Swiss-Prot record:
This is Methionyl-tRNA formyltransferase. (6S)-5,6,7,8-tetrahydrofolate binds at residues 110-113. Attaches a formyl group to the free amino group of methionyl-tRNA(fMet). The formyl group appears to play a dual role in the initiator identity of N-formylmethionyl-tRNA by promoting its recognition by IF2 and preventing the misappropriation of this tRNA by the elongation apparatus. The keyword rRNA-binding does not apply. The lineage of its organism: Bacteria, Bacillati, Bacillota, Bacilli, Lactobacillales. Pfam families: Formyl_trans_C (PF02911), Formyl_trans_N (PF00551).
């Protein structure tokens, strides 16, 4: 049985971890995940999906704010793991830790060398890519730059958003890891170096990324909305207040960027730099998420054709 240390945080990671837990060839000695966070207005403490799964299976849990130089680092190095598996962990691994095991493998949600970094799925959708994928790669000190063990891809559908694509890629990543790891560990599967000249990056999403630019084409704004749903959610401004936009559809219409070009009891169409978008699901400041019909019956009833949002 191969003894593993698993490191990851979101549901993507938990899906990969569950695959390893269900496979009798592997023993998970411990998991390392991000600390619990206070979320929402009530500041409720939220544990990571990886921690929740580890609790259910009675696995030792380590949650350092920063792994490098921590007491937890000393403890996990003493576990005697043969190797490390990471998936969307969110921290760099110290060289001393990488050197302490026989192998260290990362499950990365992009077709490397494209989209190294922390938000590959967001960028794949926002950039209008036709496919996304997962790469199983060796870990080195440089971010997502290690040799590639295996790759698998899937089409990005017009109906996909970050949430749906995360779910698809998590399953692909789990299966790809379980399929390729035995041959990799036996030496039968030889890793392939990345073409570093082709590397692109997907840095973590900043608040500035969330703001919609209505001067872009309707397809670009549509992709941006999908690439922010369900988190962190794209927004615009209405009378100085933030208006989150979860879903929209491509529409016809011409006007100034951000201008209301159609308003009925059931629809609100906003002009973009080229074409227009029909808003479907929104969330005004201080209100719950709602359909555009509910919005137009409430806060949005004051909007008129010719008004401009986003200022």
């Amino acid at each position: 049985m191969i003894k593993l240390l698993f490191m990851g945080t979101p549901q993507f990671s938990a899906t990969v971890l569950k695959g390893l837990l269900d496979n009798p060839a592997y023993e998970i000695l411990g998991v390392v995940t991000q600390p619990d966070r206070a979320v929402g207005r009530k500041k409720d403490i939220k544990v990571t999906p990886v921690k929740q799964l580890a609790l259910e299976h009675g696995i030792s849990i380590y949650q350092p704010e920063k792994l490098s130089g921590s007491q937890e680092l000393i403890e996990i190095m003493g576990l005697g793991a043969d190797g490390i598996i990471t998936a969307a962990f969110g921290q760099f691994l110290p060289t001393i830790l990488l050197d302490s095991v026989s192998f260290a493998i990362n499950v990365h949600a992009s077709l490397l060398p494209k989209y190294r970094g922390g938000a590959p799925i967001h960028y794949a959708i926002m950039n209008g890519d036709k496919e996304a994928g997962v790469t199983i790669m060796e870990m080195i000190k440089e971010m997502d730059a290690g040799d590639m063990v295996a790759k698998a891809s899937t089409p990005i559908l017009e109906t996909d958003n970050v949430g749906t694509l995360f779910e698809k890629l998590a399953i692909i990543g789990r299966d790809l890891l379980l399929d390729s790891l035995p041959a990799y560990l036996s030496g039968e599967l030889k890793p392939i170096p990345q073409d570093h000249s082709q590397a692109t990056f997907s840095p973590n999403i900043s608040p500035e990324h969330e703001k919609l630019d209505w001067t872009m084409s309707n397809q670009e704004v549509f992709n941006h909305i999908r690439g922010m749903n369900p988190w962190p959610v794209a927004h615009t401004f209405l009378e100085g207040q933030r208006l989150k936009i979860y879903e929209a559809q491509l529409a016809e219409g011409e006007g100034l960027p951000g201008q209301v070009v159609v308003k009925t009891k059931k629809s609100l169409v906003i002009a973009t730099g080229q074409g227009a978008l029909s808003l479907i699901v929104v969330q005004p400041a201080g209100k719950p998420k709602m359909s555009i019909i509910d919005f137009l019956n409430g806060i949005g009833r004051k909007l008129e054709v010719g008004d401009i949002i986003g200022r």
